[in-house]
A protein has these predicted regions:
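Single conserved hydrophobic/aromatic residue that forms the stacking wall/gate
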Residues: 1-13
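Start-of-helix signal in alpha-solenoid helical-repeat scaffolds, especially tetratricopeptide repeats
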Residues: 55, 110-113, 117
């Protein structure tokens, strides 16, 4: 693997008045290691017991619950919201444990990042389902800040 220089990921490109600018203070994109539960997706409950720190497994469990409750009253989404909230917090732990400072790119194209971004998106869906529109908006902005293309993939 070649080393990354200032011309690569350490600079974020901005467009301003048709002129390209580099943000020298922007953090480098986070590329997480493999999710600890990535091999345990066939039995989510057992996988979570074995890997409670897995954002991917919590995201899958929240997505499963959201899909089962589709079309239901808002109160039916409380369990999905709880699963998604847990996945969200596990995601923040995982990001911070790998150098994330609370902002900066988290590319969806890097497969190990997808569990984290899916868990965050699941919280957005669950929040919207129970009428937490402000939280949904914050989650949407968080995903857009992490990877603008992930919004279309995960929320729209």
């Amino acid at each position: 693997e070649r080393s990354r220089g200032l011309g690569d990921v350490y600079k974020r490109q901005l467009q301003w008045g048709g002129m390209e600018m580099k943000d020298m203070l922007a953090p480098k994109p986070i590329e997480l290691p493999a999710d600890p539960g990535a091999e345990s997706t066939s039995d989510l409950a057992a996988g979570i017991v074995a890997h409670p720190d897995s954002p991917l497994l919590w995201a899958l469990l929240a997505e499963q619950e959201l899909n089962q409750q589709e079309g239901s009253e808002p109160s039916a989404f409380i369990t999905a919201y709880a699963y998604a909230r847990t996945g969200y917090h596990r995601s923040l732990d995982r990001l911070r444990g790998n150098g994330w400072k609370g902002w900066g790119p988290v590319p969806f194209s890097h497969e190990p990042n997808q569990g984290v971004l899916r868990a965050i998106a699941a919280l957005g869906h669950a929040a919207k389902a129970i009428g937490e529109d402000d939280e949904y908006d914050r989650i949407r902005q968080m995903l857009s800040d992490a990877d603008p293309e992930s919004v279309a993939t995960l929320l729209d």
